Curated annotation (Swiss-Prot):
The modification Diphthamide is found at H602. GO terms for cellular component: cytosol; ribonucleoprotein complex. It comes from the Archaea. This is Elongation factor 2. One of its GO terms (molecular function) is GTP binding. It holds the Pfam family GTP_EFTU. SMART domains: EFG_C, EFG_IV. SUPFAM superfamilies: EF-G C-terminal domain-like (SSF54980), P-loop containing nucleoside triphosphate hydrolases (SSF52540), Ribosomal protein S5 domain 2-like (SSF54211), Translation proteins (SSF50447). The lineage of its organism: Archaea, Thermoproteota, Thermoprotei, Desulfurococcales, Desulfurococcaceae.
Length: 736
C-alpha cells in the first residue's frame, strides 16, 4: 500500500504539468494479448507486485472476464513512469477488443491521444485490428505498435532469426498500409511506423520482456540470444524480463511518440468537437487551459454501491468537487460530489483534476456515456461532443423473464442499469405480450449481459433463444395516399420512396444530422447524394433508423402549428412497420399537401397520429416492401487445404464471399453472412477445419431477404409477435 499512497500525492503534483501527462489506450484483436500487456504496465507502475502481473489480469476485474478470458469493460488506470529523469503520469484506458463491444471502443478512443496497437506475431493483423486502427485514425489518435507473442514464433513455429525479422517486416507493412489508407493527409507521413526510430516494440507480454530497434543497438542484444534463452528454459526467460523489461520499452515509446494532451487537443478538438473553435470554450479546449471554463467528456459510466461513477477526460478547466455544473445532453444542472483519479480498478479521492487528465466523478443521477459537462453559464454557447456514432447496430434480440415472478421489479431495475452502463444494449417491452426484449450486437454481447444480470444484480432470468432483428423498407416510389384523421377533419397526402445509398451513408456517418443547419445539410445532400437543393432544405426530421421526412407542401394553413405532432407521428409509424412490426429503415416520407382543421381541439395527436400512420403504411405497402436482414462480415484465416470446406459451410449458410487472399500456406477469406445463419457457425467452422481456422466477425450492413423466403419469414415474425398472420391491406388503412 505504501507505494500507492506515495504515488497519489506525487501524481497530483504532476497532473498540474501538462507536458508530463499522456492519455493512451491499448487496442487489439480479441486474444492478441491486450490485457496481459496492460498488466505488465500496471506491475511496473507499482500498483500490483511484479510477481503476479502475468496472472493477475487486474484490468479484468469482473468475474465474467476471468471465465472467458476476454475484456468486457473499459477501465482506467493512472501509471507513474520516469523517462530521462522526469516523472510522467500515463492514463491507460483499457478498451474491449471483442467485436460485440465495439461501441465501448469508439467511446474510449475519444479520450485518448495515442494507442498501443497490440498484434499477435503469428496471427498478424486481423479484422478487428483493422477496425480499431481505422476508428483511432478517425478520432485522430496516434497509433504505435507492439508485436506481441514473439515467443510463439520461437517455440511453436521454431523460426530462425531472419524469418522472425521477416515476419515483423510483414506486420509493420500491413499496419502502415492501414495508416496510409485511413489517416488524414496531414498525419500520414508523420505517423507512419518507423521501427528504426523506435515506434515499434517486439516482445512477449506473458513473459514480460520487450525490445525496440534503438534498444537492441543500445543494449547490444541479438535475436539469437532471445531464442537461446527460450531453449535454456524458464530462468533464462525470466532474465530477459530483467534485462529488457516490457514496461520500460512500451512506456518510453509512449512518452516519446504520443503527444501531450495540449499538443494533441490542438489538432483533435477541431475534428471531434463540432462547436465554434473561436469561442471562449473552443479556445480553452485548443489550449487545454486549466483556468478556462470546464469541459468534461464522459466516456464510461458504471453503477457502484454508492451510485453512478462517470469517467472521462477534462478537455478544459478543472474538475472540482462540490462545484455545480451543467449536463448538455441531459439538459440539466448537477453537482460534482466527489472527484477521483484511477489506480488500477480502484479510485483515489482528490480535490481537483486539471485539463488534460482523466478522472471520475460521483454525484450525477442519470448520466449516460457520451455526455458533455460544462461550467454553469456556458450551456448556451457550448456544443456537445458529437453525438457518438457507433459502428454496430443492435441486431439480435432475446426475451427475458425472471425465474421467480416476484423478482420482476428487480429485473426491470437491473435492465435499466445495464443500459446505462452499455448504451449498445436496447431494452423494449412488447406491449401485447408483456415480454421484456433485450437487443444487442451479437449472441456473445447478450450472453455477457445475462451473466451480468445474474452475477452483478443477482437476478436469475430465463431467456428465449436469440431472435434476429429485421428492418422493413421499400424498393420503389409509392403513389400518394390520403391519410384521414378519425374525425375526418384533417387530411394528409403522403408518398414513400427509398433513400439512395449515398444518403444513408451520410446519415450513418453523422455527416448529415437532424439538428444541423438546414442550409449546410441541403448543400451536403445536393453535392454528395444527388438531392435537389430546395427539397433538401425542407427536411423536417431524420429518425434513428435513417428515415427522412420532407415537407413539400406550399401554403397549407395551420401546418406550422401541427408540425411537431406530425413529426412525432412519423417517428411512431416507422418504429414498427406494416409488414412485421419491425423498425423501418432507409425511406423518405414526403408530405405533398394537407388540410388541417382550424380548431386545435380537432387536430391533436389522437387525430393526427392515425392519419400520418395510415398514409405512411399504405405508402410502404405500395412501394414493393421487403425485409432487410443484418449481415455479419467474417474474416477467416485457415490453412489452404481447408478452403473448399470453408466455402461449403459459407454457401450452405447463404454466405457471400467478398475476397480470398492467399499468403504462403494460409488463406484469408472475407465473407458476408446473414446473422440469422450465424448462431452455430463457430461449431461448423471448427469441425470443417479440424479447429485450425481463426476468425473475426463484425457488423457488415443490411441486405434484402431473398424473395422466396420473404412471405414465410413475415408470417413467422407476425406469429411470434401475436399479430394476425398477414399484413394489413392498403384498403384497410385508407378506406373510403
Amino acid at each position: 500500500m505504501g507505494a500507492r499512497v506515495k504515488v497519489v500525492s506525487e501524481i497530483e503534483k504532476i497532473m498540474r504539468n501538462i507536458d508530463q501527462i499522456r492519455n493512451i489506450g491499448i487496442i487489439a484483436h480479441v486474444d492478441h494479448g491486450k490485457t496481459t500487456t496492460s498488466d505488465s504496465l500496471l506491475a511496473a507502475a507499482g500498483i500490483i507486485s511484479e510477481r503476479i502481473a502475468g496472472e493477475a489480469l487486474v484490468l479484468d476485474y469482473l468475474n465474467v472476464e476471468k471465465q472467458r478470458g476476454i475484456t468486457v469493460k473499459s477501465a482506467n488506470v493512472s501509471l507513474y513512469h520516469e523517462y530521462e529523469g522526469k516523472p510522467y503520469v500515463i492514463n491507460l484506458i483499457d478498451t474491449p477488443g471483442h467485436v460485440d463491444f465495439s461501441g465501448k471502443v469508439t467511446r474510449s478512443l475519444r479520450v485518448l491521444d495515442g494507442a498501443i496497437v497490440v498484434v499477435d506475431a503469428v496471427e498478424g493483423v486481423m479484422t478487428q485490428t483493422e477496425t480499431v486502427i481505422r476508428q483511432a485514425l478517425e478520432e485522430r489518435v496516434r497509433p504505435i505498435l507492439f508485436i506481441n507473442k514473439v515467443d510463439r514464433l520461437i517455440k511453436e513455429l521454431k523460426l530462425p532469426p531472419e524469418k522472425i525479422q521477416q515476419r515483423f517486416v510483414e506486420i509493420i507493412k500491413e499496419v502502415n498500409n492501414l495508416i496510409d489508407l485511413y489517416a488524414e493527409p496531414e498525419f500520414r507521413k508523420k505517423w507512419k511506423l518507423d521501427p528504426n526510430a523506435g515506434m515499434v516494440a517486439f516482445g512477449s507480454a506473458k513473459d514480460k520482456w520487450g525490445i525496440s530497434v534503438p534498444q537492441v543497438k543500445k543494449k547490444g542484444i541479438t535475436f539469437r540470444e532471445i531464442i537461446q534463452a527460450y531453449e535454456k528454459g524458464k530462468e533464462a526467460v525470466a532474465e530477459l524480463s530483467k534485462k529488457m523489461p516490457l514496461h520500460e520499452t512500451l512506456l518510453d515509446m509512449v512518452i516519446k511518440f504520443v503527444p501531450n494532451p495540449r499538443e494533441a487537443q490542438r489538432y483533435r478538438i477541431p475534428k471531434i468537437w463540432k462547436g465554434d473553435i473561436n469561442s471562449e470554450i473552443g479556445q480553452a479546449m485548443l489550449n487545454a487551459d486549466p483556468d478556462g471554463p470546464l469541459v468534461f467528456f464522459i466516456n464510461d459510466v458504471r453503477i457502484e454501491k454508492a451510485g453512478l461513477v462517470a469517467t472521462g477526460r477534462v478537455f478544459s478547466g478543472t474538475l472540482r468537487s462540490g462545484e455545480e455544473v451543467y449536463l448538455l445532453n441531459a439538459g440539466k444542472k448537477s453537482r460534482l460530489l466527489q472527484v477521483s483519479i484511477y489506480m488500477g480498478p480502484f479510485r483515489e479521492v482528490t480535490k481537483e483534476i486539471p485539463a488534460g487528465n482523466i478522472g471520475a466523478v460521483m454525484g450525477f443521477e442519470d448520466v449516460r456515456a457520451g455526455e458533455t459537462v460544462v461550467s454553469l453559464g456556458y450551456e448556451e454557447n457550448a456544443a456537445p461532443f458529437e453525438s457518438l456514432r457507433y459502428v454496430s447496430e443492435p441486431v439480435v434480440t432475446i426475451a427475458v423473464e425472471p425465474v421467480k415472478i416476484q423478482d420482476l421489479p428487480k429485473m426491470i431495475e437491473a435492465l435499466r442499469k445495464l443500459t446505462i452502463e452499455d448504451p449498445n444494449l436496447v431494452v423494449k417491452i412488447n406491449e401485447e405480450t408483456g415480454e421484456y426484449l433485450l437487443s444487442g450486437m451479437g449472441p456473445l454481447h447478450l450472453e455477457i449481459a445475462l451473466t451480468m444480470l445474474r452475477e452483478k444484480f443477482g437476478v436469475e432470468v430465463k431467456a428465449s433463444p436469440p431472435i434476429v432483428v429485421y428492418r422493413e423498407t421499400v424498393r420503389q416510389q409509392s403513389r400518394v395516399f390520403e391519410g384521414k384523421s378519425p374525425n375526418k377533419h384533417n387530411k394528409l397526402y403522403i408518398s414513400v420512396e427509398p433513400l439512395n445509398e449515398e444518403t444513408i451513408t451520410l446519415i450513418q456517418n453523422g455527416a448529415v444530422t437532424e439538428d444541423q443547419d438546414p442550409k449546410d445539410r441541403a448543400r451536403i445532400l445536393a453535392d454528395k447524394a444527388g438531392w435537389d437543393y430546395n427539397e433538401a432544405r425542407k427536411i423536417w426530421a431524420i429518425d434513428e433508423n435513417i428515415n427522412v421526412f420532407v415537407d413539400k407542401t406550399a401554403g397549407v394553413q395551420y401546418l406550422r402549428e401541427v408540425k411537431d405532432t406530425i413529426i412525432a407521428g412519423f417517428r411512431l409509424a416507422l418504429k414498427e412497420g406494416p409488414l412485421a412490426a419491425e423498425p423501418v429503415r432507409g425511406v423518405k416520407v414526403v408530405l405533398h399537401d394537407a388540410v388541417i382543421h382550424e380548431d386545435p381541439v380537432h387536430r391533436g395527436p389522437g387525430q393526427l397520429y392515425p392519419a400520418v400512420r395510415n398514409a405512411i403504411w399504405a405508402g410502404i405497402l405500395d412501394g414493393r416492401p421487403t425485409l432487410l436482414e443484418p449481415l455479419q462480415k467474417l474474416d477467416i484465416r485457415a490453412p489452404m487445404e481447408y478452403l473448399s470446406n470453408i466455402t461449403a459451410v459459407l454457401t450452405r449458410k447463404r454466405g457471400r464471399i467478398i475476397n480470398v487472399e492467399t499468403t504462403g500456406v494460409m488463406a484469408r477469406i472475407i465473407a458476408a453472412i446473414p446473422v440469422a445463419e450465424s448462431f452455430d457457425l463457430a461449431g461448423e467452422l471448427r469441425s470443417a477445419t479440424a479447429g485450425r481456422a481463426f476468425w473475426g466477425v463484425e457488423f457488415y450492413g443490411w441486405a434484402p431477404v431473398p424473395d422466396q423466403m420473404l412471405q414465410d419469414l413475415i408470417a413467422k415474425i407476425r406469429q411470434r409477435k401475436g399479430l394476425p398472420p398477414s399484413p394489413p391491406k392498403i384498403d384497410d388503412l385508407i378506406g373510403p
